[in-house]
A protein has these predicted regions:
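Catalytic Tyr-X3-Lys loop
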Residues: 13-32, 47, 51, 75, ...
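Residue(s) in the substrate-gating loop at a strand-loop-helix junction
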Residues: 55
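Short, small/polar-rich loop/turn modules that mediate ligand/substrate recognition or access, typified
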Residues: 87, 92, 150-152
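C-terminal helical subdomain
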Residues: 95-98, 115-146, 150, 157-159
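Short C-terminal tail/terminal secondary-structure segment
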Residues: 6-9, 60, 140, 151-164
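Substrate-binding pocket helix/loop in short-chain dehydrogenase/reductase
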Residues: 10-12, 19-21, 116, 120
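Active-site helix of classical SDR
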Residues: 35, 71, 79
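Alpha-helical segment proximal to the catalytic Tyr-Lys
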Residues: 40, 84-85, 148
């Protein structure tokens, strides 16, 4: 479950209900609906892996505006509760919390003079943005049998951002 959109870093008083609903529809409700659709089949097989894409914004403020940050917190809570509820039935549930990943979603950060992208890289302990392939490799590993004992964990891939 990896659908996600940003909210242009809007604080609460700049976030109308339509924006809030849109962020939650894409980031949270899509995850809920897809999981609800596929989970019965996984339970019937007593096997399955669900990987939800959260964000470091699900741990700390500052990775997005109020709607995005709230949605990413919701994803973490959903992931942990789902993991607890279905672990004994053979369902492995975990999440990934990316930090600064250079994707089309972050194109605006690189626009113009690119000061935002430069600032983010400088604030990240490893001093760079991650490539999407780095997140893909982590996702592939988490889907393997070798990662089957990882249950309910949210794995950060953030260049050390959460260390600060």
């Amino acid at each position: 479950n990896t659908a996600g959109i940003l909210d242009a870093y809007h604080p609460l008083l700049e976030t109308d209900e339509a924006l809030w609903d849109r962020i939650f529809a894409v980031n949270v409700k899509s995850m809920y609906r897809l999981t609800q659709l596929l989970l019965p089949e996984m339970l019937q097989r007593t096997s399955g892996t669900i990987i939800n894409m959260a964000s470091i914004a699900g741990y700390v403020a500052g990775g997005g505006g109020v709607a995005y940050t709230s949605a990413k917190h919701a994803i973490i809570g959903f992931t942990k509760q789902l993991a607890l509820d279905y672990a004994s039935q053979g369902i492995c549930v975990k999440g990934i919390a990316p930090g600064a990943i250079q994707t089309p979603m972050n194109t605006a950060d690189f626009a113009g003079d690119g000061k935002m992208a430069e600032w983010v890289a400088n604030e990240t302990p490893v001093k760079r943005w991650a490539k999407p392939e780095e997140v893909a490799e982590l996702t592939l590993f988490l889907a393997t049998p070798q990662a089957s004992y990882i249950q309910g964990a949210i794995v950060p891939i953030d260049g050390g951002w959460l260390l600060k």
